[in-house]
Amino acid sequence: MSKLRKGDTVIVIAGKDKGKQGTVQAVKNDRIKVEGINIVTKHQKPNQATGVEGGILKQEAFLHISNVAILNAQTQKADRITYQFGEDGKKQRVYRSNGEVVATA
């Protein structure tokens, strides 16, 4: 289970896009898709049955979740997440560095 969720702001810590920030668009198993990160060129073949036009498309590709870290909004640095139980007894995601609750999108 991933500690990152759709809508989180993350920073890339390894790879060709190291240092860039973006918002999580999708999470699948141990891979993550981030807005504006890991742009690849896809050659799309036209298909009359579905009405898809052919051409060369630029789109985001999935990257491994170990190559990103959540961005702490207060410190503007990469951080890790842990879980704690709040006063109401619900499990909350918390930044490890300062103990603040992670804002959910």
Swiss-Prot record:
SMART domains reported in the protein's UniProt record: KOW
**How does the record describe its quaternary structure?**
Part of the 50S ribosomal subunit.
Q: Name one GO cellular component term.
A: ribonucleoprotein complex
Q: What is the lineage of its organism?
A: Bacteria, Pseudomonadati, Pseudomonadota, Gammaproteobacteria, Moraxellales
- GO terms, molecular function: rRNA binding; structural constituent of ribosome
Q: What is this protein called?
A: Large ribosomal subunit protein uL24
The encoding gene is rplX
What is a biological process (GO) this protein takes part in?
translation
Keyword list, A-Z: Ribonucleoprotein, Ribosomal protein, RNA-binding, rRNA-binding
Q: Do the record's keywords include Ribosomal protein?
A: yes
Per the similarity annotation, which family is this?
Belongs to the universal ribosomal protein uL24 family.
